[in-house]
């Protein structure tokens, strides 16, 4: 699986076991991602941050 990094033109191949791509947003600015990458399980959203996860190459 390949996931985008914070700068969308940069991407990396995920290590074994991390088979989801994610985007993390601050809830207050939910249109601008603050972090992107590979992750093993999709974290729960909280009062401050929102995660969007997907499982296809560079879908984040």
Swiss-Prot record:
Protein's name according to its UniProt entry: Cytotoxin 10
**UniProt subunit comment:** Monomer in solution; Homodimer and oligomer in the presence of negatively charged lipids forming a pore with a size ranging between 20 and 30 Angstroms.
Cellular compartment(s) = Secreted; Target cell membrane
PROSITE patterns membership: SNAKE_TOXIN
Any one biological process term the GO annotation gives: killing of cells of another organism
Give any GO molecular function from the UniProt entry. toxin activity
Disulphide linkage map: 3-21, 14-38, 42-53, 54-59
CDD domains for the chain: TFP_snake_toxin
The UniProt family comment states:
Belongs to the three-finger toxin family. Short-chain subfamily. Type IA cytotoxin sub-subfamily.
Signal sequence coordinates: none
User: Which GO cellular component terms, listed alphabetically, does the Swiss-Prot or TrEMBL entry include?
Assistant: extracellular region; membrane; other organism cell membrane
Which function does this protein serve? Shows cytolytic activity on many different cells by forming pore in lipid membranes. In vivo, increases heart rate or kills the animal by cardiac arrest. In addition, it binds to heparin with high affinity, interacts with Kv channel-interacting protein 1 (KCNIP1) in a calcium-independent manner, and binds to integrin alpha-V/beta-3 (ITGAV/ITGB3) with moderate affinity.
* Gene3D superfamilies, sorted: CD59 (2.10.60.10)
Give coiled-coil spans as residue ranges: none
User: From which domain of life does this come?
Assistant: Eukaryota
> What is the tissue specificity?
Expressed by the venom gland.
What are the alphabetically sorted keywords of the record? Cardiotoxin, Cytolysis, Disulfide bond, Membrane, Secreted, Target cell membrane, Target membrane, Toxin
Question: From which organism does this entry originate?
Answer: Naja annulifera
